Amino acid sequence: MIGMSRASKQSRSMIQAFLVAVGGAIGSVLRYYVSQLALRIAGPAFPWGTLTVNVVGCFIIGVFAEMIVRRFDASPELRLLLITGFLGGLTTFSSFSLDAISLYERGATVASAVYIAASVGLSLAAVIGGLALMRAIL
């Protein structure tokens, strides 16, 4: 940002923050709806909603990483909107952690361990799958 005035830097920063906020709002609302749907379908015994949004979000970040970052040299603004904002709002490590501890504290030790292993394993596999899909297509 050499040569940019202080006002220009502040304006750019505000636009970037706005893009993150918009993407985050959309991702957060989608996470809410997915969690509510999972709760209605599967009930409250296991955190299917959090697992779903985290795994899907990991697949999408694999797709986005290959497609918009590496292949199409996306603008920093598009990256902020989609990766930092949307996927940051959609996925949730804090809810995953709380869900795992809640299962454990309720005495569902095996379910907690399965949830942790499934979350980490499936999420990593989803990123790899997203990357591989885009590499095969592009």
How should each PLM-predicted stretch be described?
Residues 1-138:
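Membrane-interface helix-loop junctions in multi-pass transporters/channels
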